[in-house]
C-alpha cells in the first residue's frame, strides 16, 4: 500500500512516511474505531487515506516470502531486495547499495531520517547503514554519523558504547565531533536549533530511564513526552532553514509493528493515529508549497494478521 500527494513536475520537498507493520487492515481498523468514537458505524478516513493517488509496493525479501523490517526497509529505501536482517546491502551481504536519502544528499538536498523508536533500528537504518545484521547497533550508529545527514531523530541509540572495542569513543562523543548538536526533547530542540549545523534529536534522559528503545506509545503518552508529531515538526523546521535545494525527510511510525506483535489493538490504533498526526504536519507544509511537495505514506509490511 502506498498513498501519494504528487508535486507538479520534479519535487523539491519529499516526505516519506513509513508505518512499520501497517497494512491496509491497520488503517481500516483505525478508521473504523474513529467512526465509532464519533458515534456512528462505518469509517472516518485518516488524512493520508484521502490522498489522490494509491498504489501497491512489494517488500518480500530476496530470500523469504515473509520479509522483516530490515529487508523491507531496504526495499523501500533502495529499491533492492536483500536477505532478512540485512541493511543497505544486497543478498550477497557484501555489495553496498545507496538509499534514496543518500542520493538526495548527493544532489544537494538536506536530509532527515526520523522514527518513534531508536535511531539505529531497522527501518531508519535502511536509509543510511550498510550491515549484514540489523542487530549490529553500534556499527549502525557509526554508519549514521558517516552518512552525514542533516537531521536524525528517535528515542536514542541502543548501543552507544561498544564494549568489544575498549577505548572506543561512545556514539554521543563521535556525533559531537562530527558536528552534530544533540537535543534532548522538543523544548531542548527549540533552544538549540538556530545555532546547530546538524541535529540529533533524542528523548529526555528521564524518558530514557523508563524505556530507551522508543518514545512512549501514543496511548501511554505523558505531558512533555516526545511525540512523532513533534519530531516531524522539528525536522521540517530544521531542514527548511538549510540553504539547500529542498529536502528529503523519512518519518517512521515504528511502534505500530510492536503493538501488533503484542496483539494490542488499542496501541496499534493510537500509534496509527499518531502517524497520521505526523502526516498532517507535512500536509500543512504542502499547502504552503503545493507545486513542489511530494508526500508518500506506506508500510514496510503488515504485522499480526489483524482482522475485524
Where are these regions (language model features)?
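N-terminal catalytic scaffold of extracellular/periplasmic and nuclease hydrolases
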Residues: 8-193, 197-198, 302-308
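Active-site regions of oxyanion-processing enzymes, predominantly non-cytosolic
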Residues: 185, 189-202, 231-254
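Surface-exposed beta-loop-beta
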Residues: 193-236, 260
Amino acid at each position: 500500500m502506498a498513498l501519494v500527494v504528487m508535486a507538479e513536475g520534479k519535487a523539491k520537498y519529499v516526505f516519506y512516511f513509513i508505518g512499520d507493520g501497517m497494512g491496509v487492515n491497520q488503517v481500516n481498523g483505525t478508521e473504523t474505531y474513529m467512526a465509532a468514537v464519533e458515534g456512528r458505524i462505518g469509517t472516518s478516513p485518516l488524512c493520508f487515506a484521502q490522498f489522490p493517488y494509491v498504489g501497491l509496493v512489494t517488500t518480500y525479501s530476496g530470500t523469504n516470502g515473509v520479509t522483516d523490517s530490515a529487508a523491507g526497509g531496504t526495499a523501500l529505501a533502495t529499491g533492492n531486495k536483500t536477505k532478512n536482517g540485512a541493511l543497505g546491502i544486497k543478498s550477497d551481504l557484501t555489495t553496498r547499495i545507496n538509499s534514496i536519502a543518500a542520493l538526495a544528499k548527493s544532489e544537494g538536498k538536506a536530509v532527515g531520517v526520523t522514527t518513534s523508536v531508536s535511531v539505529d533500528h531497522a527501518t531508519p537504518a535502511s536509509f543510511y547503514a550498510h550491515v549484514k545484521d540489523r542487530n549490529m547497533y553500534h556499527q549502525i550508529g557509526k554508519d549514521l554519523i558517516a552518512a552525514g545527514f542533516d537531521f536524525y531523530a528517535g528515542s536514542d541509540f541502543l548501543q552507544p558504547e561498544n564494549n568489544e572495542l575498549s577505548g572506543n569513543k561512545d556514539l554521543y562523543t563521535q556525533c559531537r565531533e562530527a558536528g552534530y548538536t544533540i537535543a534532548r526533547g522538543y523544548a531542548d530542540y527549540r533552544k538549540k536549533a538556530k545555532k546547530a549545523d546538524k541535529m540529533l534529536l533524542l528523548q529526555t534522559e528521564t524518558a530514557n530511564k523508563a524505556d530507551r528503545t522508543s518514545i512512549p506509545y501514543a496511548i501511554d503518552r505523558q505531558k512533555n513526552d516526545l511525540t512523532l508529531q513533534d519530531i516531524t515538526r522539528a525536522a521540517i523546521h530544521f531542514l527548511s532553514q538549510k540553504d539547500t535545494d529542498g529536502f528529503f525527510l523519512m518519518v517512521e511510525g515504528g511502534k505500530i509493528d510492536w503493538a501488533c506483535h503484542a496483539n494490542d489493538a488499542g496501541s496499534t490504533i493510537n500509534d496509527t493515529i499518531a502517524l497520521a498526526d505526523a502526516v498532517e504536519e507535512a500536509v500543512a507544509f504542502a499547502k504552503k508549497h503545493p507545486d513542489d511537495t511530494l508526500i508518500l505514506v506506506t508500510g514496510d509490511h503488515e504485522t499480526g494478521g489483524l482482522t475485524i
